[in-house]
Amino acid sequence: LKYDSLPELPQMTENVRYDGSLKASVILKDLAPFVPALSRFEEPLDLNLVFSGHGKHLDCPTLRLTNHHGLMIAGEAALSNWDAGMDMYIYGKLGNLTMTKEGINVLMTNLTGKVPPILQRLDYIRFNGEAAGYLHDLTLTGLFYTGAGMVKTDVMMSIDEQSMSRTYSGSVASADLDLGKLLNQEKKFGKVDFNVELKGFNYKNRYPESYIKGIISSFEYSQYQYENIMLDGVYKDGGFNGRLSMDDANGSVQIDGNFNVAKTIPDFNLKASVKNLRPHDLHLSDKYENASISLDLTADFTGKSIDDMNGRISLDSLQLNAPDEGGCFLDNLTITAGQVSGEKELRINSSFMTAVIRGDYSYHTIPASVVKTVQRYIPSLLTIKDNMPEPHNNFQFDICLENTEVLSKLFQIPLELYLPASLKGYFNDGEEKLHVEGHFPEFRYNGTRYDSGVLFCENPSDRFKCSLRGGMLMKSGAMLNFSVEANAKNDHLETTINWGNNTDVTYGGKFAADTRFFK
């Protein structure tokens, strides 16, 4: 008997009948010449097989496979037209497939050389179900039981005979999958109840691809159970195009459009509507108790962050309802970013503020720009940390605040403007220069009223200079005027503070300090 492929086997007519049984200890590595993936399976498996058939039809009413590492497979199977290639018909029933934690580790180590952490956290796997259909269209139904919960599957696997690529369509559902255990983040995530339909699920370019439609009935996150989350769209190349929505007792969210954060330069083109979202009740914030937020958002931009953003974000009809503290309303805030005359430019426009930032900027390195500039003049006071990023900022900024109602209510900043305020200047790391100039004509901070506030910081020559002056309204109604001047050079800091009042009985004072730093 010469065997090279199934067609090489003797041709059997329907009149040929056969039966038999096999009890043996087998080593799957011996089949590695035919199935290379079995090359690591050196442990013996106990096989118990009973079969019978006629012609090209084979029945296996008994199929049992076990080992000494917590693996057991028990079921039955049938094959029709077993030499028909992709047109072979298969029926299989697994009454019990069980793998202990040790069995999972042995199986995955032999298959891939390593065990994915997510499988290590399953503790065990039990499966019972059926597989039926032609090899090119095979339906798989059954129940998976694991240490993280139960999953029900009803999926058809289709194989393209030309490319031999596999696609999967069907439904996957669970009522109690412990996502926190799977992700090893049990403090953040809890159980999820979902029923999802997939169409054409496959892998292309290292990413899964599928049409997805379904409902997540409940999802525990941050000790809160979200409800009624709907998905309807296409997941492809690491991105999603479709609709995501949530209709929870503590807020509703609907997102339409597409986004892809897996690209080298992520892109977003979507619209979002948020209604009566309660961040405190959702455990998203320890602030905003008894408050709700509603807004509409339109985003059409590319970029990983504000540093390389190119496009537009528009926030409309922001409504904060806070019965205890009063609410606020913002009709629109628009952020646009891109290239203007060969330079990056970021613009913010709204009824309460405008801002323009132009040049080469990186927001997360701005603190490093300040520290490294000041460190030139007081090196013994400021130490540059090894992990501090190297800044290359060279930009100008001009910010104007008309009022701070939104900032104070939304971000709970205790600042109130009576007149518009401005902040402008520049950073230039190449020349090791900075200039910051702020004007705050009249404002209240943390309950105290000030006027004529002016701030200057710059290093025009061989020293770093900062000055702050203004007036503070006292409880008696008198105005206390003050100024602070600071000059730093060569580990030497000169500080002068002046103050005085404007009442009938005047008083004032001056405090001067000369500080030297050593290391």
Q: What are these regions, as identified by a protein language model?
A:
Residues 1-519:
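Interface amphipathic segments
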